[in-house]
Amino acid sequence: MENFAHKHITDGVKTVILRTPMIVPKWGNQSSICPPLGLAYVAAALSQTKFEVRCIDALGEAPFQKIISEDNKFVNYGLSTKQILQHLSHKEFNVLFVSVMFSQDWTIVRYIIKTIKKAYPDIFLVCGGEHITACPEFCMEDCPEIDVCILGEGEESSVDLLKTIEQKRSLS
């Protein structure tokens, strides 16, 4: 079966790379914020291949903004989902890369993905990162809004994926 989930992309590939907020237990210790080097490498590889890329670092843009979870057990550090949507509204894009670095972040990342896909149903949604690499089948079943998972180092795979989309070839 051929997969043409990218059929809505007709005017060139325009990509946003999103680093989501970080979630930690409310009463736990927080490690220092680490820069998203993997996303920086992916963005650089795509830019060098002449793809249009914009980045949103939801943690880096608001590292001290705390949002307490409804059950009062967790703290999200970074932009809220509403703020992420506001950032996206100022960008023209048809492909969204989302990084899931840590399994503890999956619940908030899944919620953000579902919210974004509801607001932008025609985007092509790509996920990568350590959590995705560790359990891609689970992630795609748990969040069917994901179109493709990139496993392991993402630089070459991301470039190959966008070339495939740009050339309107099958993903299979």
Residue ranges and their predicted role:
Residues M1-I9, H87-L88:
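Short boundary motifs at domain starts and secondary-structure transition points
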Residues V24, P35, L151-G154:
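Active-site-proximal structural scaffolding
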Residues A45-T49, R54-S172:
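Glycine-rich beta-alpha loop elements in corrinoid/cobalamin-binding modules
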